[in-house]
A protein has these predicted regions:
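Single conserved hydrophobic/aromatic residue that forms the stacking wall/gate
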Residues: 1-7, 12
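Beta-sheet entry/capping signal
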Residues: 50-52, 120, 128-131, 136-137, ...
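Short, flexible loop/turn elements at secondary-structure junctions
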Residues: 57-61, 82-84, 136, 189-194, ...
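Short secondary-structure boundary/capping segments
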Residues: 69-72, 141-154, 267-268
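Active-site-proximal helix-loop-helix substrate-binding element of RNase H-like nuclease domains
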Residues: 88-90, 98-105, 140, 149, ...
């Protein structure tokens, strides 16, 4: 058992770590010990009552693909979908002709207005689980990075219902990435869930390929444009449709595969946070 010293942050294990042949073993994840003790029986849950949201962003690419470590390019749009209602909300910086009853388009006067409008919506609708394709390594860090860059750390921390957001740099396959832990929200990247629970190797884990393999559907093609910059510059209407379809594809993957539902069931069974199922 790992005991904590009175009046000190140092635990017994730390105190004796320099002593030769004196190993102290124990489990110091006290939260899970508390949960196990207080809830010894099986915990019932209603998946339908969970607030689950899918998110996808689009960013300018004036200087190549946006670098998440720098967050130097302006954001163009943010699209979110509520899994319970299936309603889609789009925050965009240019006019868009909306023809769908399930889509609400919020026209914003530039990026700062877009981020403030999104943050207002976010604070009123904090999700229990946030998902999307590569959302943990791209969408979330880019939103947090731009909020901090434009408005400061205090406003960025409003992404957490507890106003606690920690960031760290991690290395994946030799490449540096930044992740943000928004306390109170479980970010369940659907790409990671797919890799974890499908037990198959794919030639590509791009959303376009996986959606075609699993659903027979693809992302909206924009090959008629010379590059991505030409796409959002010259065809904003289709560009927003492209953003919406990316969110819908992730929802359709969940409808078929129910990987989020599986992760939640495992988490309740093991009495851990949903993100911890990655490590089982």
């Amino acid at each position: 058992i790992v005991h904590r010293l009175v009046g000190s942050e140092m635990c017994i294990r730390d105190r004796y770590k320099e002593v030769p042949n004196f190993e102290v073993h124990g489990y110091d994840r006290y939260l899970y010990q508390f949960i196990s003790k207080e809830f010894p029986d099986e915990v019932d849950f209603d998946f339908k009552k969970m607030n689950i949201m899918s998110l996808d962003i689009e960013v300018q690419c004036e200087n190549g693909f946006p670098n998440v470590l720098e967050c130097a390019e302006d954001m163009l749009s943010i699209t979110v979908q509520d899994y319970a209602t299936r309603k889609i909300k789009v925050f965009g910086t240019r006019p868009y002709k909306n023809t769908r009853d399930d889509v609400e388009y919020i026209l914003c006067d530039g990026e700062e207005h877009l981020l403030r409008a999104f943050l207002d919506y976010w604070i009123q609708n904090f999700p229990d689980i946030l998902t999307g394709w590569n959302v943990e390594l791209y969408d979330v860090p880019y939103i947090c990075g731009r909020l901090e860059r434009l408005f400061g750390e205090k406003e960025m921390k409003m992404m957490s219902p507890w106003n606690i957001v920690h960031d760290e740099e991690i290395e994946i396959k030799g490449r540096k990435n930044k992740v943000y832990n928004m306390y109170g929200i479980n970010v369940m990247d659907y790409m990671d869930l797919y890799k974890k629970f499908t037990y198959t190797n794919q030639e590509s884990y791009r959303l376009d390929h996986i959606a075609f393999v699993e659903l027979g559907q693809r992302k909206l093609d924009h090959s008629e444009h010379e590059n991505f910059k030409a796409f959002y510059t010259n065809d904003w209407q289709k560009f927003i449709d492209y953003n919406i379809i990316d969110v819908e594809l992730v929802s359709r993957l969940e409808d078929k595969m129910k990987l989020i539902e599986l992760a939640v069931a495992l988490a309740y069974d093991a009495k851990v946070n949903v993100r911890d199922v990655y490590y089982q």
